[in-house]
Every structure is written in structure tokens, then in C-alpha cells.
Amino acid sequence: MMIEIIPKISIPKNGLGSFTRPCRRIEFSYCNWGGSSKGMKEFLSTKLESLAKESQDVEFHVTNRQGKHPLIRAYYNTGREKVICTRKMSASSIFQKAILCRDSDGLKPRLIKYPVESTNPSVRGIWSPFSDQAKPHEIYKKKSP
């Protein structure tokens, strides 16, 4: 009896076939008059275009706020927003902060108590050689005759 192999391509049926970035919009604000916006103005004139070409699924807005320090404000699909003050930062560090905003998920930082998360935690806990204190190990020495 011979088995025939039918060549097929697996097609995702649950909607997981595409990746959507959690960050949907990034807003850059600066002031024309203030000296704290010098790095932001340099970033907007040199590096913003390359960042926008890299991430075409994110919407970029540039606003002028007179008398205010420059900000990066990121809006996420979860409804949260992250605000980073870029006062007196260089253009390269503002670029790194913009990439950080673009790549983060927008969730609140949370404390991870255990390195492994499980849906069914162990009844006895995780075994460790130091946890068995009831029976300490003994070192046996050979007695010489």
C-alpha cells in the first residue's frame, strides 16, 4: 500500500496571518524659539524621513508648541499613550527614543515575580537542592584499616 503526499500550503484561519504594530501614531512637538528644542529641530530636518520610511505602518505628526519643551508622544492600540520629554537631547538620542516608542507595546511595566508563568502552578513548588533541609546530606569517608 502506497501513501500519497498531497502538497498543501498551510493557511492561518484564526487571523494571525499578519503583524500589526502596537504603536499607531507618534507625535513630535517642538518650539521654534526655545533653545531646548535644538536637538528636536535637527532630528526633524535630518532623521525623521528615514524613520518614516522604515515604519510605514505608523502615523507621524509634527506640531509646533510655542514656549514648551519638546516632546515625543506615542499612541498605542491599547488606548494608552507614552510621553517622553526630549529637552536638550541630541538628534541621535531622540532618534533612539523614537525607535523605543515605536517598538514598545504600550503596556504598563509590571513586576514579574517568577521567571516562568504557568496556567497550572505546581502544587509542591519548584524543586531545589537547597529546599530539602529535613535530610541534610552526609559525606561518607572511607575508613582506613
Curated annotation (Swiss-Prot):
GO terms for biological process: mitochondrial translation. It comes from the Eukaryota. Pfam families: L51_S25_CI-B8. Its main location: mitochondrion. Keywords: Mitochondrion, Ribonucleoprotein, Ribosomal protein. GO terms for cellular component: mitochondrial large ribosomal subunit; mitochondrion. InterPro entries: Ribosomal_mL43, Ribosomal_mL43/mS25/NADH_DH, Thioredoxin-like_sf. It is found in: Mitochondrion. Disulfide bonds: none annotated. GO terms for molecular function: structural constituent of ribosome. PANTHER family: 39S RIBOSOMAL PROTEIN L43, LARGE RIBOSOMAL SUBUNIT PROTEIN ML43. Component of the mitochondrial large ribosomal subunit (mt-LSU). Mature yeast 74S mitochondrial ribosomes consist of a small (37S) and a large (54S) subunit. The 37S small subunit contains a 15S ribosomal RNA (15S mt-rRNA) and at least 32 different proteins. The 54S large subunit contains a 21S rRNA (21S mt-rRNA) and at least 45 different proteins. Component of the mitochondrial ribosome (mitoribosome), a dedicated translation machinery responsible for the synthesis of mitochondrial genome-encoded proteins, including at least some of the essential transmembrane subunits of the mitochondrial respiratory chain. The mitoribosomes are attached to the mitochondrial inner membrane and translation products are cotranslationally integrated into the membrane. Also has an extraribosomal function, being essential for mitochondrial genome integrity. May interact with MHR1 to take part in the mtDNA repair mechanism. Belongs to the mitochondrion-specific ribosomal protein mL43 family. This is Large ribosomal subunit protein mL43. It comes from Schizosaccharomyces pombe (strain 972 / ATCC 24843) (Fission yeast). The lineage of its organism: Eukaryota, Fungi, Dikarya, Ascomycota, Taphrinomycotina. The gene is mrpl51.
